[in-house]
UniProtKB/Swiss-Prot annotation:
This is ADP-ribose pyrophosphatase. It comes from Methanocaldococcus jannaschii (strain ATCC 43067 / DSM 2661 / JAL-1 / JCM 10045 / NBRC 100440). Keywords: Hydrolase, Magnesium, Metal-binding. InterPro entries: Nudix_hydrolase, NUDIX_hydrolase-like_dom_sf, NUDIX_hydrolase_CS, NUDIX_hydrolase_dom. Residues 38-168 form the Nudix hydrolase domain. Binds 3 Mg(2+) ions per subunit. PANTHER family: ADP-RIBOSE PYROPHOSPHATASE, DIHYDRONEOPTERIN TRIPHOSPHATE DIPHOSPHATASE. Belongs to the Nudix hydrolase family. NudF subfamily. One of its GO terms (molecular function) is metal ion binding.
Amino acid sequence: MAKKCFCISGKIFALNLFGKRYSKKIIKKRDLKKYRLYLHPAVAVDGIIEKDNKILLIKRKNNPFKGCFALPGGFVECGETVEEAVVREIKEETGLIPKVKSLLGVYSSPDRDPRGHVISIVFILDVIGGELKAGDDAKEAEFFDLNNLPKLAFDHEKIIKDYMRWKNG
């Protein structure tokens, strides 16, 4: 899961050094000694969209938790903000066009994802367009009554409980 760098034609492609963006910067192997490379957790985003006391969930097409329901979301790609990532992931998985409304929270338990240490940043979003249709790595996309949710993947049950506390404030 933890990737520091990889080789391109005998040179090193550094993705992130000391928290600064070095997008597509090629660094010679001998110059890499100047930098200390660290293993980092992966960063993911999840989105909460509510409509008529129902919450949008997707059925996962792939492992981990294949066949389980989850909040729509995924990994942040290099060069995008977390807000851009959550909008992209929701478009890809549900067909809806969302707009970020608020930050709900950050979930960072090292064991929340069986693939490794993944930090998830969770946003509350409004729908501004699109049509609900499962896509990308979502087998299904549908709204579920907040009082009758299916078994959820990862720590998404905790996230939804936190959302309900935020909502009822």
